[in-house]
Amino acid sequence: MGADCKSVAKATQVRILHLPPQVRAYFSRMPFGVDRSVVIRAEHLFGPDYARALVDRDLTTIEELVAVTPTKLRSEVRRAAGRIAELGGWIAQDSGDPVKAEQLTRRAEDHVRSADPALRAMVSMRRSNILLASDPRLAVELAADAAQLIEGRSVGRLAVSVARQRALAAIADRDRARFVAHAAHALDIAPTEPVADDHAVYANSAYVAAEVASGFIAINQPAKALDLLLGHHHGWPAGQRRDHAVASARLLRTFIVLGDYHAALDHMDVAVRGYLAAPSDRARRELRLCRRIIRDRARADQHFPLRTLRRRIEATLQGDTEP
Protein backbone atom coordinates (compact mmCIF):
# COMPACT_ATOMS: atom_id res chain seq x y z
CA MET A 1 0.00 0.00 0.00
CA GLY A 2 1.45 3.38 -1.03
CA ALA A 3 2.29 6.35 1.19
CA ASP A 4 -0.97 8.18 0.34
CA CYS A 5 -2.96 5.09 1.23
CA LYS A 6 -1.09 4.76 4.54
CA SER A 7 -1.75 8.38 5.45
CA VAL A 8 -5.48 7.96 4.84
CA ALA A 9 -5.47 4.76 6.90
CA LYS A 10 -3.62 6.56 9.70
CA ALA A 11 -6.20 9.34 9.68
CA THR A 12 -8.90 6.70 9.97
CA GLN A 13 -7.10 5.12 12.95
CA VAL A 14 -6.87 8.51 14.68
CA ARG A 15 -10.61 9.00 14.17
CA ILE A 16 -11.27 5.57 15.74
CA LEU A 17 -9.89 6.81 19.07
CA HIS A 18 -12.66 9.40 19.31
CA LEU A 19 -15.53 7.04 18.56
CA PRO A 20 -17.79 5.49 21.20
CA PRO A 21 -16.64 1.94 22.04
CA GLN A 22 -19.88 0.47 20.68
CA VAL A 23 -18.95 1.48 17.14
CA ARG A 24 -15.15 1.37 17.32
CA ALA A 25 -15.16 -2.23 16.14
CA TYR A 26 -16.72 -1.12 12.86
CA PHE A 27 -13.75 0.99 11.87
CA SER A 28 -11.19 -1.50 13.17
CA ARG A 29 -12.21 -3.80 10.31
CA MET A 30 -11.75 -1.21 7.60
CA PRO A 31 -11.07 -1.11 4.75
CA PHE A 32 -11.73 -4.73 3.82
CA GLY A 33 -14.73 -5.61 5.94
CA VAL A 34 -18.02 -4.04 6.92
CA ASP A 35 -19.75 -5.10 10.13
CA ARG A 36 -23.30 -4.10 9.29
CA SER A 37 -24.63 -5.17 12.69
CA VAL A 38 -22.33 -2.76 14.55
CA VAL A 39 -23.51 0.23 12.50
CA ILE A 40 -27.13 -0.81 12.99
CA ARG A 41 -26.52 -1.01 16.74
CA ALA A 42 -24.94 2.44 16.56
CA GLU A 43 -28.09 3.73 14.89
CA HIS A 44 -30.23 2.21 17.63
CA LEU A 45 -27.99 3.73 20.33
CA PHE A 46 -27.32 7.17 18.89
CA GLY A 47 -29.98 7.67 16.23
CA PRO A 48 -30.03 7.67 12.41
CA ASP A 49 -28.28 11.04 12.03
CA TYR A 50 -25.26 9.73 13.93
CA ALA A 51 -25.16 6.49 11.95
CA ARG A 52 -25.55 8.31 8.63
CA ALA A 53 -22.67 10.63 9.49
CA LEU A 54 -20.62 7.61 10.51
CA VAL A 55 -21.23 5.87 7.20
CA ASP A 56 -20.71 9.05 5.15
CA ARG A 57 -17.32 9.68 6.76
CA ASP A 58 -16.22 6.12 6.25
CA LEU A 59 -17.45 6.00 2.66
CA THR A 60 -15.42 9.13 1.91
CA THR A 61 -12.35 7.53 3.45
CA ILE A 62 -12.65 4.25 1.62
CA GLU A 63 -13.36 5.95 -1.71
CA GLU A 64 -10.11 7.85 -1.19
CA LEU A 65 -8.44 4.50 -0.59
CA VAL A 66 -9.82 3.16 -3.88
CA ALA A 67 -7.86 5.79 -5.79
CA VAL A 68 -4.50 4.86 -4.24
CA THR A 69 -4.85 1.12 -3.70
CA PRO A 70 -2.76 -1.20 -5.91
CA THR A 71 -4.74 -2.77 -8.72
CA LYS A 72 -4.59 -6.29 -7.27
CA LEU A 73 -6.29 -5.10 -4.05
CA ARG A 74 -8.67 -2.57 -5.56
CA SER A 75 -11.56 -5.00 -6.07
CA GLU A 76 -11.58 -5.76 -2.34
CA VAL A 77 -11.65 -2.08 -1.46
CA ARG A 78 -14.43 -1.44 -3.97
CA ARG A 79 -16.38 -4.34 -2.51
CA ALA A 80 -16.10 -2.78 0.94
CA ALA A 81 -17.06 0.63 -0.45
CA GLY A 82 -20.11 -0.91 -2.08
CA ARG A 83 -21.23 -2.50 1.17
CA ILE A 84 -20.79 0.76 3.06
CA ALA A 85 -22.72 2.71 0.42
CA GLU A 86 -25.52 0.13 0.44
CA LEU A 87 -25.70 0.32 4.22
CA GLY A 88 -25.91 4.10 4.03
CA GLY A 89 -28.75 3.74 1.54
CA TRP A 90 -30.59 1.41 3.89
CA ILE A 91 -30.23 3.85 6.80
CA ALA A 92 -31.41 6.75 4.62
CA GLN A 93 -34.44 4.79 3.42
CA ASP A 94 -35.44 3.71 6.91
CA SER A 95 -35.09 7.33 8.02
CA GLY A 96 -37.53 8.49 5.33
CA ASP A 97 -35.07 9.89 2.77
CA PRO A 98 -35.60 7.88 -0.45
CA VAL A 99 -33.63 10.36 -2.60
CA LYS A 100 -30.48 9.93 -0.51
CA ALA A 101 -31.13 6.20 -0.34
CA GLU A 102 -31.27 5.97 -4.14
CA GLN A 103 -28.10 8.04 -4.54
CA LEU A 104 -26.10 5.88 -2.14
CA THR A 105 -27.40 2.62 -3.56
CA ARG A 106 -26.47 3.74 -7.08
CA ARG A 107 -22.97 4.40 -5.73
CA ALA A 108 -22.99 0.91 -4.28
CA GLU A 109 -23.92 -0.46 -7.72
CA ASP A 110 -20.94 1.33 -9.24
CA HIS A 111 -18.55 -0.14 -6.68
CA VAL A 112 -19.78 -3.75 -6.87
CA ARG A 113 -20.14 -4.04 -10.64
CA SER A 114 -17.33 -6.65 -10.74
CA ALA A 115 -18.05 -8.21 -7.34
CA ASP A 116 -19.46 -11.66 -6.68
CA PRO A 117 -23.04 -12.34 -7.89
CA ALA A 118 -24.48 -12.51 -4.36
CA LEU A 119 -23.33 -9.01 -3.45
CA ARG A 120 -24.51 -7.60 -6.77
CA ALA A 121 -27.87 -9.29 -6.25
CA MET A 122 -28.20 -7.81 -2.78
CA VAL A 123 -27.56 -4.30 -4.07
CA SER A 124 -30.04 -4.75 -6.95
CA MET A 125 -32.62 -6.03 -4.49
CA ARG A 126 -32.08 -3.03 -2.21
CA ARG A 127 -32.45 -0.59 -5.09
CA SER A 128 -35.64 -2.36 -6.13
CA ASN A 129 -37.02 -1.84 -2.63
CA ILE A 130 -36.18 1.86 -2.65
CA LEU A 131 -37.95 2.35 -6.00
CA LEU A 132 -41.21 0.58 -5.11
CA ALA A 133 -43.21 3.80 -4.86
CA SER A 134 -41.47 5.95 -7.47
CA ASP A 135 -40.74 3.46 -10.27
CA PRO A 136 -42.48 0.10 -9.71
CA ARG A 137 -41.71 -1.18 -13.22
CA LEU A 138 -37.96 -0.70 -12.68
CA ALA A 139 -38.35 -2.22 -9.22
CA VAL A 140 -39.76 -5.37 -10.86
CA GLU A 141 -36.84 -5.52 -13.30
CA LEU A 142 -34.19 -5.02 -10.60
CA ALA A 143 -35.71 -7.73 -8.40
CA ALA A 144 -35.75 -10.09 -11.39
CA ASP A 145 -32.09 -9.23 -12.07
CA ALA A 146 -31.24 -10.09 -8.47
CA ALA A 147 -33.01 -13.44 -8.76
CA GLN A 148 -31.14 -14.26 -11.97
CA LEU A 149 -27.77 -13.42 -10.40
CA ILE A 150 -28.21 -15.94 -7.58
CA GLU A 151 -30.06 -18.66 -9.48
CA GLY A 152 -28.51 -22.05 -8.70
CA ARG A 153 -26.21 -20.61 -6.02
CA SER A 154 -26.17 -21.34 -2.30
CA VAL A 155 -26.77 -17.89 -0.84
CA GLY A 156 -28.85 -18.72 2.23
CA ARG A 157 -31.47 -16.18 3.21
CA LEU A 158 -30.54 -13.80 0.42
CA ALA A 159 -32.67 -16.02 -1.84
CA VAL A 160 -35.56 -15.59 0.61
CA SER A 161 -35.20 -11.82 0.67
CA VAL A 162 -35.01 -11.63 -3.12
CA ALA A 163 -38.20 -13.72 -3.44
CA ARG A 164 -39.91 -11.41 -0.95
CA GLN A 165 -38.73 -8.38 -2.93
CA ARG A 166 -40.12 -9.82 -6.15
CA ALA A 167 -43.49 -10.13 -4.41
CA LEU A 168 -43.35 -6.53 -3.15
CA ALA A 169 -42.35 -5.24 -6.58
CA ALA A 170 -45.20 -7.16 -8.22
CA ILE A 171 -47.80 -5.68 -5.90
CA ALA A 172 -46.32 -2.19 -6.39
CA ASP A 173 -46.71 -2.77 -10.14
CA ARG A 174 -50.34 -3.90 -9.56
CA ASP A 175 -49.63 -7.43 -10.78
CA ARG A 176 -51.78 -9.53 -8.47
CA ALA A 177 -51.00 -12.91 -10.03
CA ARG A 178 -47.24 -12.42 -9.88
CA PHE A 179 -47.50 -11.15 -6.32
CA VAL A 180 -49.35 -14.27 -5.18
CA ALA A 181 -46.83 -16.54 -6.92
CA HIS A 182 -43.75 -14.77 -5.55
CA ALA A 183 -45.26 -14.45 -2.07
CA ALA A 184 -46.00 -18.18 -1.99
CA HIS A 185 -42.42 -18.94 -3.04
CA ALA A 186 -40.97 -16.57 -0.43
CA LEU A 187 -43.08 -18.10 2.34
CA ASP A 188 -42.15 -21.60 1.17
CA ILE A 189 -38.40 -21.00 1.40
CA ALA A 190 -38.54 -18.69 4.44
CA PRO A 191 -37.29 -21.39 6.89
CA THR A 192 -33.91 -21.39 5.06
CA GLU A 193 -30.95 -21.22 7.42
CA PRO A 194 -28.36 -18.47 6.87
CA VAL A 195 -24.99 -19.28 5.33
CA ALA A 196 -21.58 -17.78 6.05
CA ASP A 197 -21.44 -14.12 4.97
CA ASP A 198 -25.18 -14.17 4.29
CA HIS A 199 -26.29 -10.80 2.91
CA ALA A 200 -29.84 -11.16 4.28
CA VAL A 201 -29.63 -12.97 7.61
CA TYR A 202 -32.62 -10.87 8.74
CA ALA A 203 -34.95 -12.62 6.22
CA ASN A 204 -36.42 -15.17 8.62
CA SER A 205 -39.96 -16.54 8.54
CA ALA A 206 -41.40 -13.75 10.70
CA TYR A 207 -39.86 -11.06 8.49
CA VAL A 208 -41.11 -12.59 5.25
CA ALA A 209 -44.61 -13.11 6.66
CA ALA A 210 -44.79 -9.48 7.80
CA GLU A 211 -43.50 -8.17 4.48
CA VAL A 212 -45.88 -10.08 2.22
CA ALA A 213 -48.79 -9.40 4.58
CA SER A 214 -48.85 -5.83 3.27
CA GLY A 215 -49.44 -7.18 -0.22
CA PHE A 216 -52.34 -9.34 0.90
CA ILE A 217 -53.96 -6.28 2.46
CA ALA A 218 -53.48 -4.48 -0.86
CA ILE A 219 -55.30 -7.22 -2.81
CA ASN A 220 -58.17 -7.20 -0.31
CA GLN A 221 -57.18 -10.36 1.56
CA PRO A 222 -56.69 -8.93 5.06
CA ALA A 223 -57.68 -12.24 6.69
CA LYS A 224 -54.65 -13.87 5.03
CA ALA A 225 -52.48 -11.01 6.26
CA LEU A 226 -53.85 -11.47 9.77
CA ASP A 227 -53.01 -15.18 9.76
CA LEU A 228 -49.45 -14.45 8.67
CA LEU A 229 -48.88 -11.69 11.20
CA LEU A 230 -50.42 -13.50 14.17
CA GLY A 231 -48.60 -16.71 13.28
CA HIS A 232 -45.23 -15.04 13.79
CA HIS A 233 -46.03 -12.25 16.24
CA HIS A 234 -44.00 -13.81 19.05
CA GLY A 235 -41.29 -15.34 16.86
CA TRP A 236 -39.00 -12.36 16.38
CA PRO A 237 -35.31 -12.45 17.37
CA ALA A 238 -34.18 -9.80 19.85
CA GLY A 239 -31.90 -8.19 17.27
CA GLN A 240 -34.78 -7.24 14.96
CA ARG A 241 -36.71 -4.84 17.15
CA ARG A 242 -37.30 -2.43 14.29
CA ASP A 243 -38.66 -5.08 11.93
CA HIS A 244 -40.82 -6.38 14.78
CA ALA A 245 -42.15 -2.86 15.39
CA VAL A 246 -43.09 -2.57 11.71
CA ALA A 247 -44.88 -5.92 11.85
CA SER A 248 -46.71 -4.86 15.01
CA ALA A 249 -47.90 -1.62 13.39
CA ARG A 250 -48.98 -3.62 10.33
CA LEU A 251 -50.96 -5.96 12.57
CA LEU A 252 -52.72 -2.92 14.02
CA ARG A 253 -53.61 -1.78 10.50
CA THR A 254 -54.90 -5.25 9.65
CA PHE A 255 -57.25 -5.27 12.65
CA ILE A 256 -58.55 -1.86 11.59
CA VAL A 257 -59.02 -2.89 7.95
CA LEU A 258 -61.01 -5.91 9.15
CA GLY A 259 -63.17 -3.67 11.34
CA ASP A 260 -62.08 -5.46 14.52
CA TYR A 261 -61.66 -2.25 16.50
CA HIS A 262 -61.68 -3.93 19.91
CA ALA A 263 -58.75 -6.15 18.88
CA ALA A 264 -57.03 -3.05 17.51
CA LEU A 265 -57.48 -1.28 20.84
CA ASP A 266 -56.13 -4.31 22.70
CA HIS A 267 -53.06 -4.30 20.44
CA MET A 268 -52.55 -0.54 20.40
CA ASP A 269 -50.23 -0.35 23.42
CA VAL A 270 -47.95 -3.05 21.97
CA ALA A 271 -47.78 -1.32 18.59
CA VAL A 272 -47.08 2.11 20.06
CA ARG A 273 -44.42 0.82 22.46
CA GLY A 274 -42.68 -0.98 19.61
CA TYR A 275 -42.72 2.10 17.40
CA LEU A 276 -41.41 4.43 20.11
CA ALA A 277 -38.67 1.98 21.11
CA ALA A 278 -37.50 1.38 17.53
CA PRO A 279 -38.88 4.12 15.25
CA SER A 280 -38.57 3.89 11.49
CA ASP A 281 -40.16 5.38 8.42
CA ARG A 282 -41.68 1.97 7.65
CA ALA A 283 -43.54 1.81 10.98
CA ARG A 284 -44.54 5.46 10.71
CA ARG A 285 -46.08 4.81 7.29
CA GLU A 286 -48.12 1.96 8.78
CA LEU A 287 -49.44 4.25 11.50
CA ARG A 288 -50.26 6.92 8.90
CA LEU A 289 -52.29 4.35 6.98
CA CYS A 290 -54.11 3.47 10.20
CA ARG A 291 -54.88 7.14 10.75
CA ARG A 292 -56.14 7.57 7.19
CA ILE A 293 -58.50 4.58 7.40
CA ILE A 294 -59.86 5.68 10.77
CA ARG A 295 -60.42 9.27 9.60
CA ASP A 296 -62.37 8.03 6.58
CA ARG A 297 -64.50 5.64 8.61
CA ALA A 298 -65.07 8.05 11.49
CA ARG A 299 -67.15 10.27 9.21
CA ALA A 300 -69.88 7.62 9.28
CA ASP A 301 -69.09 5.90 12.59
CA GLN A 302 -68.62 7.86 15.81
CA HIS A 303 -68.63 4.90 18.17
CA PHE A 304 -66.19 4.68 21.08
CA PRO A 305 -63.56 2.28 19.63
CA LEU A 306 -62.96 4.38 16.51
CA ARG A 307 -62.80 7.63 18.47
CA THR A 308 -60.33 6.12 20.91
CA LEU A 309 -58.17 4.62 18.17
CA ARG A 310 -58.09 7.93 16.34
CA ARG A 311 -57.07 9.82 19.47
CA ARG A 312 -54.28 7.35 20.31
CA ILE A 313 -52.83 7.29 16.80
CA GLU A 314 -53.01 11.09 16.46
CA ALA A 315 -51.11 11.38 19.75
CA THR A 316 -48.45 8.91 18.60
CA LEU A 317 -47.98 10.76 15.30
CA GLN A 318 -48.11 14.21 16.88
CA GLY A 319 -46.19 16.65 14.70
CA ASP A 320 -46.31 14.37 11.65
CA THR A 321 -47.61 16.42 8.72
CA GLU A 322 -47.80 13.65 6.13
CA PRO A 323 -51.36 12.68 5.08
Spans of model-derived segments:
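Conserved binding/catalytic microenvironments
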Residues: 20-323
